[in-house]
C-alpha cells in the first residue's frame, strides 16, 4: 500500500516524467493534455514528457510547428546564408515565414537600414540602380551604334 502512495506523490503533474516510480500506463492516459495531437510533437514515446513541443530550427516554422502546438517560433534571422529571397542587409524579420515572403523582409529592411546607417542604404541603393540602368544603357548604346 505504501507503494501506491509513493506513486501518487511521484506523479502530481498531469504529464508524468520518466521516473522509476512512475509507470508508463497512468502517464499514457494523461498524454492528451500533456502533448496535443500535432505534427510538431509526434507520438513516438507513450509518455510525452515535454509539455511544450520544441520548435524546429529551419525558417518555415509554421509549416512544421502549427499554432495548435504550444511552441512559439522565435525570431530568427530573416536572411540566412542559404536563403536568397531577402537582401543580405536584412537583420531580422517579425514573421517566421520570412523566407517564403520576401516582401516581409524588404519593408522591415528599409526601415532598419535607414535608421541604422543611411550610408549603407545609399550604397545598396546605388548598386541596385546601377544594375538596371547599366543594362538599359548597354541596350541604348547598341541601338545607337
From Swiss-Prot:
One of its GO terms (biological process) is binding of sperm to zona pellucida. Residues 116-145 have a biased composition (Polar residues). Keywords: Cytoplasm, Fertilization, Membrane, Mitochondrion, Phosphoprotein. GO terms for cellular component: cytoplasm; mitochondrial membrane; mitochondrion. This is Sperm mitochondrial-associated cysteine-rich protein. Residues 105-145 are annotated as: Disordered. It comes from Rattus norvegicus (Rat). Testis. Selectively expressed in the spermatids of seminiferous tubules and in flagella of epididymal sperm. It is found in: Cytoplasm; Mitochondrion membrane. The lineage of its organism: Eukaryota, Metazoa, Chordata, Craniata, Vertebrata. It is a peripheral membrane protein. Involved in sperm motility. Its absence is associated with genetic background dependent male infertility. Infertility may be due to reduced sperm motility in the female reproductive tract and inability to penetrate the oocyte zona pellucida. The modification Phosphoserine is found at residues 38, 45, 113, 131.
Amino acid at each position: 500500500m505504501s507503494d501506491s502512495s509513493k506513486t501518487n506523490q511521484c506523479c502530481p503533474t498531469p504529464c508524468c516524467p520518466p521516473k522509476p516510480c512512475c509507470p508508463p500506463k497512468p502517464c499514457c492516459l494523461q498524454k492528451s493534455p500533456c502533448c496535443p495531437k500535432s505534427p510538431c510533437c509526434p507520438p513516438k514515446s507513450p509518455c510525452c514528457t515535454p509539455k511544450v513541443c520544441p520548435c524546429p530550427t529551419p525558417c518555415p516554422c509554421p509549416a512544421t510547428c502549427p499554432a495548435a502546438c504550444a511552441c512559439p517560433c522565435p525570431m530568427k534571422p530573416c536572411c540566412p546564408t542559404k536563403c536568397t529571397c531577402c537582401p543580405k542587409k536584412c537583420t531580422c524579420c517579425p514573421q517566421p515565414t520570412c523566407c517564403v515572403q520576401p516582401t516581409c523582409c524588404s519593408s522591415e529592411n528599409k526601415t532598419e537600414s535607414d535608421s541604422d546607417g543611411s550610408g549603407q542604404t545609399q550604397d545598396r541603393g546605388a548598386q541596385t540602380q546601377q544594375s538596371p540602368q547599366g543594362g538599359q544603357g548597354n541596350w541604348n548604346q547598341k541601338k545607337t551604334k
